[in-house]
Regions:
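Transmembrane helical cores of multi-pass secondary ion antiporters/exchangers
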Residues: 1-390, 403
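Cytosolic regulatory regions of ion transport systems
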Residues: 312, 318-330, 340, 344-532
Length: 532
């Protein structure tokens, strides 16, 4: 056992190291995890003989539960609502179109059987949220036309549909499925997945509001239990557990939950670990000696998928919405294949004993996708003029504050402010704060003591990040159209004695509240409630 623990720790450390190296040289980290697995595998340097596909399927399926759950939990529904219809159509109709177009190519061009052709189409019909957003975030790419939200919802929600198609075509390839059985399977998958997802989410919200966790970290453990049961319960009744996990995640993620920021950080780490696990196992299970036999069909399928099937499905779905051509091209290119395709391919490999090596074909397709699509995504975004340059000067400061023990705030000097017309050296600032930048129109000024503050100056102040703050519990409240707070001034609202509104988010902008601010539909109030 000690040997296994030692190897596991070494693999984790190497994955973290490779993640840092890959970010510097511009290669997606997930590709590095695959290569590391290959080096540890039976054909690699470490010669670890591991070919237990059934065991790997169980591990990877469990890992995918957390990836699906967090995919929903991290989705900002307020921002995603504008593209929800397009995203859902891409994640359902788009997946089906991709599956069938790819299946037709495999049958007629590669002379595969109908069953295996459509099974391969199902395995690679969904896109990978983790792959896309690890690249967008590491390269700090902001996309125009709300494309980031579109990709987030689509890639987070299309795995359940791909899973349903995979299960259906596995049954077909086994010869145990009739049209009636397939119809019943699809109905049960959708019905139990949606029903259990909503019920578990609502029950979880009730429990989270009733239970007060006395020990730090128990709320995260409780959420792990929710994620697991959100998959296991519907799956027990032949429902779509991945769909249920995603629904539970998206409902809980957009509900007022205590300590949500820490939960996000926790699941961010868990999801990162699950990605390492899945892609490392993919490399470990593979036999590089078998890859030359599948590289040609895998490359042909990848090219067809990338340049025909995916663009055609995107065009059929987005053109009726009059989406711009360059947005459609970027969405098409962003269809990276990853974790879900790997897990489903292992599932198919264990369930079907076909002569064709479906696992290594999917392995090569994922490899091509991450290497080519992933590496070129920033370049494609620039060439299509889809980068939305940040208008807010604070973006750079926020990026820096993630790595240093310092935070930045900004304030605009209004007319008749006490600081107007005064030199910096004559101002009385709060203790341990410093004005580090003044933005005056289009000019950025590094101030000194002789700098004079003018009306409409935007001041950026730095302050030390606290190690730990006690007594603060932040919750969010969304102002709906029928809310009794809608269209009222803050001064007209009666508040509890132990809470204060510290921030209002409106159309992507942050408003520091005062009594003269009037609330409107869609406002997100960030409230601090005292903790005793």
């Amino acid at each position: 056992m000690n040997t296994y623990l030692l190897i596991t720790s070494i693999v984790i450390f190497l994955c973290i190291l490779l993640n840092r190296v890959s970010n510097r040289i511009g290669i997606p980290a997930l590709l590095a995890f695959i290569v590391l697995g290959m080096l540890f595998g039976s054909d690699g340097i470490m010669k670890i003989d591991f070919d237990n596909y059934a065991f790997a399927e169980q591990i990877c399926s469990t890992a995918l539960i957390f990836i699906m759950f967090y995919g929903g939990f991290g989705t900002n529904w307020q921002r995603a609502k504008a593209v929800a219809v397009k995203s859902v159509l891409l994640s359902t109709i788009g997946v089906i179109i991709t599956c069938f177009i790819t299946g037709l190519f495999c049958h007629f061009a590669l002379n595969m059987s109908w069953e295996i052709s459509f099974l391969l189409g199902a395995l690679i019909s969904s896109t990978d949220a983790a792959s896309v957003f690890s690249i967008l975030r590491s390269k700090k790419l902001n996309l125009k036309y709300n494309t980031a939200s579109l990709l987030e919802v689509e890639s987070g929600s299309n795995d359940p549909c791909a899973y349903m198609l995979t299960v259906a075509f596995i049954a077909v390839s086994q010869g145990s499925a009739s049209p009636g059985n397939i119809a019943i399977l699809i109905v049960k998958q959708l019905a139990f997945g949606i029903i259990f997802g909503v019920l578990i989410a609502k029950l979880s919200i009730m429990l989270l509001r009733y239970i007060r966790f006395k020990s730090a970290g128990f709320d995260a453990i409780f959420m792990v239990g929710i994620a697991l049961i959100s998959y296991a319960l519907p799956a027990y009744f032949d429902g779509n557990g991945f769909l249920s996990a995603y629904i539970v995640g998206i409902i809980l993620g957009n509900t007022e939950i205590e300590n949500k920021k820490n939960l996000v950080n926790f699941f961010d780490g868990i999801t990162g670990l699950m990605q390492m696990l899945i892609f490392f196992l993919l490399g470990l299970l593979s036999f590089p000696s078998k890859l030359p036999h599948v590289i040609v069909p895998a490359l042909l399928i990848f090219m067809w998928l990338t340049f025909v099937a995916r663009p055609l499905s995107v065009a059929l779905v987005l053109t009726p919405f009059r989406s711009k051509i360059k947005q459609q091209l970027l969405v098409s290119w962003s269809g990276l294949r990853g974790a879900a395709s790997i897990v489903f391919s292992i599932m198919a490999y264990t369930a079907t004993n076909d002569d064709l090596d479906t696992f290594h074909i999917i392995f090569m397709i994922v490899l091509f996708s991450i290497l080519l699509q992933g590496s070129m995504l920033p370049w494609i975004s620039r060439k299509l003029d889809m980068l939305d340059k940040p208008a807010d000067v604070m973006k750079t400061f926020n990026d820096y504050s993630e790595e240093a023990d310092i935070q930045f705030i900004q304030l605009t000097i209004p007319e008749n402010h006490l600081w107007c017309g005064h030199k910096l050296k004559d101002l009385t600032l709060p203790p341990e704060t410093l004005i580090v930048l003044i933005r005056r129109g289009e000019q950025n000024i590094i101030p000194d003591g002789e700098t004079i503050i003018l009306q409409n100056d935007v001041l950026v102040l730095s302050a030390i990040t606290p190690d730990e703050v006690h007594g603060i519990r932040l919750v969010e409240k969304i102002i709906e159209k029928d809310s009794r707070y809608n269209n009222k001034l803050l001064s007209e609202i009666s508040k509890k004695h132990n809470e204060i509104i510290i921030m209002i988010q409106r159309n992507g902008q942050v408003i520091i509240p005062n009594g003269n601010v009037r609330l409107t539909t869609g406002d997100i109030l960030v409230i601090n409630r005292a903790v005793n």
